A protein has these predicted regions:
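Short, Lys/Arg-rich flexible segments
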Residues: 1-152
Length: 152
């Protein structure tokens, strides 16, 4: 069960990263255990496996939106948003994760909903998400946005 959960979380992670250059991307709520996500981020920084201070602070980091910011930065090279949609370099992930992620994306099992463009503009006028990608703020974790006209 734990392995299945980590695979699903990895797949969710794939659809949670925004292209920081275009300030747009995909969002979803992190459900279940974030162990595998924390593992990927810490492994990416080549930290010793028995030393994961990042995981100890996981909840507070998630609360501050720092975790998503770090995750987006880590995976920026693997995922990008174009005017035609989202491009994922699957070489960075296991075939099992790829399969689940593709399935989730195609069948929309993540329960994602479009974010109204008015909401984006309102958040921008309030000073949110103007200087940093919306995904980095962690404030729109329940919504999905991928508007070609936004942030280009």
């Amino acid at each position: 069960f734990k392995k299945k959960t980590s695979v699903i979380n990895n797949a969710r992670m794939v659809v949670t990263v925004a292209d920081t250059q275009h300030h747009r991307g995909l969002y979803t709520r992190f459900q279940g255990s974030n162990f595998e996500l924390a593992k990927i981020v810490t492994d990416n920084e080549k930290q010793p496996k028995n030393n994961r201070p990042f995981m100890k602070k996981e909840k507070s980091i998630l609360d501050k939106g720092e975790y998503r910011k770090k995750l987006a930065k880590t995976l920026k090279g693997y995922i990008s948003c174009t005017e035609n949609g989202m491009y994922v370099d699957w070489n960075g992930f296991s075939s099992e994760v790829e399969q689940v992620a593709r399935d989730l994306l195609i069948k929309d099992r993540l329960g994602l909903k479009p974010l109204d463009p008015v909401t984006i503009r309102r958040k921008e006028s309030a000073g949110e998400g103007s200087s940093t990608p919306l995904v980095a703020t962690g404030q729109l974790a329940d919504a999905i946005i991928c508007y070609p006209e936004y942030g280009v």
